[in-house]
Amino acid sequence: MSTSDSIVSSQTKQSSWRKSDTTWTLGLFGTAIGAGVLFFPIRAGFGGLIPILLMLVLAYPIAFYCHRALARLCLSGSNPSGNITETVEEHFGKTGGVVITFLYFFAICPLLWIYGVTITNTFMTFWENQLGFAPLNRGFVALFLLLLMAFVIWFGKDLMVKVMSYLVWPFIASLVLISLSLIPYWNSAVIDQVDLGSLSLTGHDGILITVWLGISIMVFSFNFSPIVSSFVVSKREEYEKDFGRDFTERKCSQIISRASMLMVAVVMFFAFSCLFTLSPANMAEAKAQNIPVLSYLANHFASMTGTKTTFAITLEYAASIIALVAIFKSFFGHYLGTLEGLNGLILKFGYKGDKTKVSLGKLNTISMIFIMGSTWVVAYANPNILDLIEAMGAPIIASLLCLLPMYAIRKAPSLAKYRGRLDNVFVTVIGLLTILNIVYKLF
């Protein structure tokens, strides 16, 4: 074999799929699978079989194209080790950096409020329905749970991060196991309700409106945007020097594609399994009760008449416990991002960016009081979680995940090669439809 053949063979071997690529595929997948997934079956199943089938068709394109667009933006910076904030500042100046800081903070903070409401409702449902105790005061329950989490965060942050990383895979395995375990309880109610003669495309409960609102919950549930910047930096440092930026972009796209396929397979199977076990009417009731689908499933099995099997009893309690663990995991993960973002905003605008004027401990205390205080107020008010996702959480995520990369592709010279593509139109439409939910909710 010649020297040139040896070099080509070596480069091919080095550039093939690596263990680190598998690790990142699973990492992106694990980041997206959180408490938001527990609300997707409710919105997806709310309109019956046909809307959820249409969402199944849209799920992978939404997950893949939107995250690939964000990854391309992160890849466009001149510094291989630069994160998304540095890249946006490079393209749009300091103002762009401030905008991205605000977007990151306001994309994550409402999620904490959502999880505050969710964990309060889930705990109270478990307390009353599974444990059979008398109802507790809502304000007290919310305060107790938030103080408990604040205590864990304040005194055990490092331990918390380790526990979170260990909980990702048991939670995903639990979702798959529950999806499979529900198969014996599947029924034809959702199919029997399909009446092609009375189907409506428009109107409040029409297919188009249901799918439109479903897009928001898909953007929310199929979201690993918080980790995309770190992922791209890691891949650029690993591949770009030896194989170039174009190869790195293709590798990132390949990893995002595989992560998206895994994510869609698990979440959609879970959603279909829940829908075939329950019914669209049950999903509407779960939305009205403002609880995640696992809590509703637990109550559903608790209300079964006749002799319940050991499996049904186990599933009743396991569903609630898994829901609580999932929400705790998601809350802790998003708290760290919110804390970092709020600390940055306070430092930038309160202390003019001078880190010597304030200690990290003081910053953390100020931020924690605001975060936990605002979360308690929202948890006590108990707004509808799906409405909160559709009106706040998803639109802000869409502005970061969909519209910011599309604007950058249009304006930044280093992204000019991606202009004029159909997938750009798709990502833009998804972003605009998600943001327009705010208008729909107002009227």
Curated annotation (Swiss-Prot):
GO molecular function: L-serine transmembrane transporter activity; symporter activity; threonine efflux transmembrane transporter activity
Domain of life: Bacteria
Keyword Signal (UniProt): no
Record key words, sorted: Amino-acid transport, Cell inner membrane, Cell membrane, Membrane, Symport, Transmembrane, Transmembrane helix, Transport
Aminoacyl-tRNA synthetase in keyword set: no
Reaction it catalyzes: L-threonine(in) + H(+)(in) = L-threonine(out) + H(+)(out); L-serine(in) + H(+)(in) = L-serine(out) + H(+)(out)
Its membrane topology: Multi-pass membrane protein
Family under the similarity heading: Belongs to the amino acid/polyamine transporter 2 family. SdaC/TdcC subfamily.
Protein name listed in UniProt: Threonine/serine transporter TdcC
Organism lineage string: Bacteria, Pseudomonadati, Pseudomonadota, Gammaproteobacteria, Enterobacterales
